[in-house]
Amino acid sequence: MTNLLPEMAEIWQQTLNWQPTDSQQARFQQLYELILEGNRQLNLTRITEPQEFWEKHLWDSLRGVAPQQQLISSLQLGASVIDIGTGAGFPGVPVAIIASNSTITLVDSTRKKITFIDTILSELALTNAKTLVSRAEEIGQQPQHREQYDVALIRAVGTASPCAEYTLPLLKLGGLAVIYRGTWTEEETTSVENAAQQLGGTVELIDNFTTPLTNSVRHCLYLRKVAKTPANFPRAVGVPSQKPI
């Protein structure tokens, strides 16, 4: 018996003012099954129970692109989106499922993970998504990626300042970086404001909320690109995390 994901139509509506179509829900289910299968070889995620997967992977991914509970309008119009350090494909694959007019580039430095995501994209027939084996510090200096994206997504594993350095160089003027975080402090606000300013960005919103099933604390930071990023950013691989701005 296959584990079925919950539909949660009411929660989607209440928290994002949106709910998935039948075909999007079917793709969510297919994604879940593929991740469970891939997990046997690759250790992609510890989150495998249906409700937990729905909340911590699907809902969490999409809540980030819905600041103050409204989906970013450019996603429906045809944005160019990049997901940095996508891992098992979050948040980028769920975003690709719901934003069929947008193009999503999924970046990770681990080739095995990207090979697995290629399988997912093929199985789900997600023609609006593509993958790239690289690091943010490298592509941020490449003309085909620098200042080419409308939206940059990153699930923060450390402090926010390196995330600002990974994302802002990739954005066009007016573009939006979304940094997904758990807890957040006022001290971090000061440091990320300083980093963003040096990188041509400004902190537009710090959205704090709780997840709908387990009431876990979440924060999403939204940085707007308001000026060109100086040419020396991003710095070399490893430097942003070792020596944050």
Curated annotation (Swiss-Prot):
S-adenosyl-L-methionine binds at residues 85, 90, 108-110, 136-137, 155. Belongs to the methyltransferase superfamily. RNA methyltransferase RsmG family. Pfam families: GidB. InterPro entries: rRNA_ssu_MeTfrase_G, SAM-dependent_MTases_sf. One of its GO terms (molecular function) is rRNA (guanine-N7-)-methyltransferase activity. GO terms for cellular component: cytosol. Its main location: cytoplasm. NCBIfam families: rsmG_gidB. This is Ribosomal RNA small subunit methyltransferase G. It comes from Nostoc sp. (strain PCC 7120 / SAG 25.82 / UTEX 2576).
